């Protein structure tokens, strides 16, 4: 016997996902697979899917937080596409990022041009004071 075999072998540690190692909720492994299958580049580095998953998770959290605020402002407990639309269009940076995106069932932002509003007369100005 050469002493090789199953005796004294190392105990294998429990598998830990790359998402949990990075402290993310989004799937790093899936993002890596999609980057490889998408023919974006011949090779994909180990850090690229972690970074991309982190960016996607941050953007999602930001949009959901603003949409949740919009839902609460409308006295609703469920986020609907209208709340997503209001959240994105009222935020300057998100609106710039998603400017060309159409959200189904999102509606439009309420907006009335100033020239179309009724003009204030002298009697109305006196009443308001």
From Swiss-Prot:
The keyword Nucleus applies. The modification N6-lactoyllysine is found at residue 10. Core component of nucleosome. Nucleosomes wrap and compact DNA into chromatin, limiting DNA accessibility to the cellular machineries which require DNA as a template. Histones thereby play a central role in transcription regulation, DNA repair, DNA replication and chromosomal stability. DNA accessibility is regulated via a complex set of post-translational modifications of histones, also called histone code, and nucleosome remodeling. The nucleosome is a histone octamer containing two molecules each of H2A, H2B, H3 and H4 assembled in one H3-H4 heterotetramer and two H2A-H2B heterodimers. The octamer wraps approximately 147 bp of DNA. Transmembrane segments: none annotated. The modification N5-methylglutamine is found at residue 105. Residues 1-22 are annotated as: Disordered. Keywords: Acetylation, Chromosome, DNA-binding, Isopeptide bond, Methylation, Nucleosome core, Nucleus, Phosphoprotein, Ubl conjugation. Monoubiquitination of Lys-120 (H2AXK119ub) gives a specific tag for epigenetic transcriptional repression. Following DNA double-strand breaks (DSBs), it is ubiquitinated through 'Lys-63' linkage of ubiquitin moieties. Glutamine methylation at Gln-105 (H2AQ104me) by FBL is specifically dedicated to polymerase I. It is present at 35S ribosomal DNA locus and impairs binding of the FACT complex. The modification Phosphothreonine is found at residue 121. Residues 7-19 have a biased composition (Basic residues). Belongs to the histone H2A family. This is Histone H2A.J. It is found in: Nucleus; Chromosome. Gene3D superfamilies: Histone, subunit A (1.10.20.10). GO terms for cellular component: nucleosome; nucleus. One of its GO terms (molecular function) is DNA binding. The modification N6-acetyllysine is found at residues 6, 10. Its main location: nucleus. InterPro entries: Histone-fold (IPR009072), Histone_H2A (IPR002119), Histone_H2A/H2B/H3 (IPR007125), Histone_H2A_C (IPR032454), Histone_H2A_CS (IPR032458). It holds the Pfam family Histone_H2A_C. It comes from the Eukaryota.
């Amino acid at each position: 016997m050469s002493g090789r075999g199953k005796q004294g072998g190392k105990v294998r540690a429990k598998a830990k996902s790359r998402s949990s190692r990075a402290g993310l909720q989004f799937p790093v492994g899936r993002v890596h697979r999609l980057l490889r299958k998408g023919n974006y580049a011949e090779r994909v580095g180990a850090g690229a899917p972690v970074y991309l998953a982190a960016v996607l998770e941050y953007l999602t959290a930001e949009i959901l937080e603003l949409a949740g605020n919009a839902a609460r402002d409308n006295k609703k407990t469920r986020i609907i596409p209208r709340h997503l639309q209001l959240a994105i269009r009222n935020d300057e940076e998100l609106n710039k990022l998603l400017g060309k995106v159409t959200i189904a069932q999102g509606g439009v932002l309420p907006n009335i041009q100033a020239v179309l509003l009724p003009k204030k007369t002298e009697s109305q100005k006196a009443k308001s004071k």
